[in-house]
Regions:
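Interdomain regulatory linker/hinge segments that flank or connect interaction modules
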Residues: 84-123, 165-208
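Functional transmembrane alpha-helices
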Residues: 2, 92-100, 212-247, 251-252, ...
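Alpha-helical transmembrane segments of multi-pass membrane proteins
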Residues: 15-19, 74, 116, 392-401, ...
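Residue-level signature of transmembrane alpha-helical entry/exit and packing/kink sites
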Residues: 3, 7-11, 100-109, 113, ...
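Terminal peptide-recognition signature
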Residues: 22-25, 64, 151, 159-162, ...
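PDZ/PDZ-like domain segments forming the peptide/carboxylate-binding groove
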Residues: 127-171, 209-247, 251-255
Length: 460
């Protein structure tokens, strides 16, 4: 419960910052061009609000709603998600959105997206200035990588060290590395201490590379018992630090990657068990191991968990701690170009990955607030918090600029149409478009959060 609260608080604080500043972008340009803002709210307030106030001589009511799904800035004379059609029937007023020239209305609509994007670049810059950049380069991962059968068919071997492609060297083992490999025609590696290259098709499906079990490529993790949990199957077996597990159910496990894969297979069998007896049978495994103090091979049968849960109960040695960490420090002025470059790469990667959303697997990967919350660490960490806030700011900026009615991008699309053709879409058309866009957003919200629920119950 404590972990859930920490993640939930981080998500709520992050989204509150982003929503306030996003709506603040609309607010700023509205005030700049003399457009009246009727309401400025954090969180939505259907039926009631937690509190609100209206400063003296101000046209704007500020408030806090109770539904933490965002916020809004109600601008006079604008067809938006408030669906205030009565106002649009009244004569046009000089302080209304609809009375302003198209270029001013355009800036008001892109104000939120602009603020979110600039905010992300600023946060990344300040992170680099305050903490610097720490990472483990792929070429410094001396144990190399672990590859699945599809990768091995292309010529990769376990323990190959990935260096880069024709596009340049990999920085570290991350999503950018996967993106480069998926579109590369050549990958440079180090095998047995010698540099060499492999030819690639250039059109690998990145989503399949990541979704496959095992994945196309993973960091090779040696199987090294670091510590054993009390009263766990591992402790009942008498395992301790330094001992080696050699096989599970007759399947050889040479790495922690192999070990996790075999436990996953046990979990798959357990998931299809229909009776308690079947569950016990699935959880009963033969384990071949060797004590650090002896060269004698041992083989025992044990129950992998006391409950219907696959669990062995030991902590593996974190191999990443053995590798050289590269640290780059940035001065105040140096941090801005570095932060801008970093943020731009994040945006480019996110936009490039959007094509996978329209695939069957991509649709399953959609997530709602539960998925967003899970991205935050289980302990409060300001570095991780600001990194995630900057990332969410980029997502918010990109998603809002999509040409979907009810989003900023939908309004921008119709404004650009007006500026190019000189014809302004009618109010009735805009109202209908807003309803359609709102329906699309509600549907996406339901699907994304339904996916969270299905994942929580292990159905997806």
């Amino acid at each position: 419960m404590e972990v859930f609260l920490i993640k939930a608080l981080q998500l709520m604080l992050s989204l509150s910052i982003l929503v306030l500043l996003h709506e603040g972008g609309h607010f700023f340009f509205s005030k700049l061009f003399g457009v009246r803002v009727e309401k400025f709210y954090l969180f939505f307030d259907p039926w009631f609000h937690l509190f609100e106030f209206k400063p003296k001589n101000s046209d704007t009511t500020y408030g806090l709603g109770w539904l933490p799904l965002g916020g809004y800035c109600k601008i006079s004379g604008m067809i938006d998600e408030s669906f205030d059609t009565e106002q649009m029937k009244q004569p046009e007023q000089p302080y209304e959105f609809r009375s302003k020239p198209a270029w001013q209305r355009l800036l008001i609509m892109v104000g939120g997206v602009l603020v979110n994007f600039v905010l992300a670049l600023f946060i990344y810059s300040m992170i680099l200035f305050h903490w610097g950049d720490d990472y483990v380069s792929t070429k410094d991962m001396t144990q190399g990588m672990k590859f699945n059968t599809e990768a091995k068919a292309l010529g990769f071997q376990d323990h190959d060290i990935l260096v880069g492609t024709e596009k340049g060297e990999f920085k570290t083992f991350d999503g950018d590395m996967y993106r480069d490999i998926s579109t590369a025609s050549r990958v440079d590696i180090i095998r047995n201490g010698k540099p060499m290259s492999l030819n690639l098709p250039g059109d690998l499906d990145m989503l399949s590379m990541i979704k496959e079990s095992p994945r196309f490529v993973e960091v090779y993790i040696p199987l090294q018992i670091d510590s054993v949990m009390k009263d766990s199957p591992a402790s009942k077996l008498g395992l301790a630090k330094g001992d080696k597990i050699l096989a599970i159910n007759g399947k050889k496990v040479e790495s922690f990657n192999d070990f996790q894969l075999e436990l996953g297979r046990v979990g798959d069998v357990l998931a299809s068990a229909s009776t308690h007896q079947d569950s016990v049978k699935a959880l009963t495994a033969s384990v071949e191991y060797m004590k650090a103090s002896s060269d004698t091979l041992k083989n025992n049968v044990l129950l992998l968990a006391d409950k219907e849960n696959v669990k062995f109960g030991f902590y593996n040695h974190p191999v990443m701690l053995d590798y050289k960490v590269t640290h780059i420090s940035y001065g105040f002025f140096q941090s801005f170009p570095a932060g801008i470059k970093y943020g731009w790469n994040v945006l480019a990667g996110y936009v490039g990955d959007m094509k996978y959303v329209f695939s069957k697997e991509g649709a399953k990967s959609l997530g709602g607030f539960g998925a967003l919350g899970s991205l935050f660490p289980s302990m409060w960490d300001w570095h991780a918090f600001w990194m995630m806030t900057a990332f969410l700011s980029i997502i918010l900026a990109f998603m809002n600029i999509l040409p979907i009615p009810a989003l900023d991008g939908g309004h921008v699309f119709f404004l650009l149409y007006e500026m190019i053709t000189g014809r302004k879409p009618g109010d009735k058309f805009m109202e209908r478009a807003e309803y359609v866009g709102f329906g699309i957003l509600v549907l996406l919200l339901v699907v994304a959060n339904l996916n969270d629920v299905l994942r929580f119950f292990g159905i997806m």
